[in-house]
């Protein structure tokens, strides 16, 4: 399990190091990586880009959503209002608008010598957008727990963080496995929207390929293939979610 995560995370970490640290740039210029051409993220595309965006958005949006779910139920008014404002703002804006703002408008407010890659900006934008929905799903699980669980944890002398980490959140997350899975499925199926900002994942590549005269008349086959790929991914996620429900017996 952890080896699989390392296989996905290490390339991303290496990209950040190679992109933003002078040492690695000099390392390339010296020819120690001779024969390897630098590929900008704007040239990335296809199914691999779909996987990259989906994976990093999934691992980023979940902890952010959990934090704002707890913040919305906080006893401190400032934290609660900030959390409510964050959730309601992102839930009230269409994802396509969020992507357009992150790719086109946001760089205008940055200093001239400061640059954030378009792909990174889109991943951050999608993560924040989906985090608002994850927060509401988790909040539903927190509200479903009886108050006796909180009182029992406090009677054992647990503080706020220990109570939520060891008692409240494990139970709440088990209750909302279907809701979280549904949000993650929607995230994966929303990745084709990045086509509007010039990033070509699998559907974007199909839209580009069908304009090629050599591929005229084959657009239907391409879209059917893409639909099958998305169905396989979503079915696998749904099946895994169902197995988790059965493992933790969330319906009892």
Model-derived regions: residue spans:
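Transmembrane alpha-helices and adjacent helix-loop boundaries
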Residues: 1-252
């Amino acid at each position: 399990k952890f080896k699989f995560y390392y296989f996905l995370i290490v390339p991303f970490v290496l990209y950040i190091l190679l992109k933003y640290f002078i040492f690695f740039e000099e390392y390339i210029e010296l020819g120690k990586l001779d024969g390897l051409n630098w590929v900008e993220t704007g040239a990335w595309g296809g199914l691999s880009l779909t996987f990259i965006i989906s994976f990093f958005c999934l691992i980023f949006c979940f902890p952010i959503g959990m934090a704002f779910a707890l913040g919305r139920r906080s006893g401190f008014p400032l934290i609660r209002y900030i959390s409510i404002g964050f959730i309601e703002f992102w839930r009230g804006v269409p994802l396509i608008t969020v992507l357009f703002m992150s790719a086109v408008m946001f760089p205008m407010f940055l200093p001239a010598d400061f640059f954030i890659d378009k792909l990174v900006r889109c991943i951050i934008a999608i993560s924040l957008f989906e985090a608002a929905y994850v927060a509401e799903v988790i909040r539903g699980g927190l509200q479903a727990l009886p108050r006796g669980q909180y009182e029992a944890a406090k009677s054992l002398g647990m503080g706020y963080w220990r109570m939520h980490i060891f008692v409240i959140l494990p139970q709440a997350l088990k209750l909302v496995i279907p809701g979280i899975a549904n949000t993650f499925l929607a995230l994966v199926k929303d990745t084709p929207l990045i086509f509007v900002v010039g990033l070509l994942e699998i559907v974007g590549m199909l839209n580009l390929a069908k304009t090629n005269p050599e591929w005229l008349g084959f657009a239907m086959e391409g879209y059917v293939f893409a639909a099958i790929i998305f169905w396989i991914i979503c079915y696998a996620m749904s099946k895994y979610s169902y197995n988790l429900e059965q493992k933790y017996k969330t319906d009892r």
